[in-house]
């Protein structure tokens, strides 16, 4: 909330007459420390998966009021072109784009998930695209639908026009869960090369975000550069999952060093996933990442502040917490506890300490 400015000129005059100095902190407007769109969240399951219930207006309003200025969402290719490339069902994406536009929250779509007909190995859902051109054509259809001249905006003039200008091409291709055929470097570079051409033909001002890299991400980034990837993306992306807060900054710095070595010192970086799960004592096999809910909240605040303090030096354009809402019920998956909020079994939502930490951090960094 903005601080009230109670007649600062008159108050200063009265203090001057009394021989006292005016207190500038009471009159000063809160100072924004980060650019607009810097604090974001990932709308992961259960609200971001288009095969489920999609995003709800009430939750997106809660995002906006708590300081979320960018929302990363999954656009699953397999949902839009399940049966073949001839036609695209935009229904799941329309719902997401419409809800975000209605609540004036910018989107960063991550486009992934190969339909069976387009896979290298049709029986493996994690298999990569057999032909980059198929993915490129799908990306073109998304720009035609949601870009500056998109058909979605013509059909929904009741909505604020919020065209999508930034697209993230895939997620963690260095992980077999998302790209089964390893090593992935050459095939992934071919994919983003074809997709970027298709996107820019339809929107010359569009920007392409590299897939978020995980683990020893700086090593993976170097491999992408060596495979010729440099000219095919406009933003770097990294997922600095680590046990220690200090290692988050170190991982981001390592990626910046690699980018600089390959001539991309000025290319901006997005931290498209940052998290610690509040899974301590909740899963059968404890992991090094497990934290209590209060630990999770304090790490969130410290990590956002640490990255904000170094955002200019490291070229960090935005940071996304993963995730907005999780179930917090799994006995085997720590990442089911990463949410700022928890979805109860009865369908109601509980705000966790991390939610309030995010909101307070956003108010401070965004000058609210």
Question: Predicted regions: what is each one?
Answer:
Residues 42-57, 78-91, 117-118, 174-178, ...:
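Acidic-and-aromatic substrate-binding clefts and catalytic sites of carbohydrate-active enzymes
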Residues 2-27:
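Secretory targeting and sorting signals
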Residues 27-69, 74:
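Boundary/entry segment of secreted carbohydrate-active catalytic domains
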Residues 37-43, 69-73, 107-111, 165-169, ...:
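Hydrophobic faces of well-ordered beta-strands that scaffold small-molecule active sites
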Residues 51, 89, 118, 163, ...:
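Aromatic-rich peripheral "rim/lid" segments of glycoside hydrolase catalytic domains that contact
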Residues 63-216, 225, 229:
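Substrate-binding cleft and catalytic face of glycoside hydrolase catalytic domains
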Residues 20-32, 239, 368:
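N-terminal low-complexity, Pro/Thr-rich disordered segments
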Residues 34, 50-53, 136, 140-165, ...:
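Noncatalytic carbohydrate-binding groove/subsite architecture in carbohydrate-active enzymes
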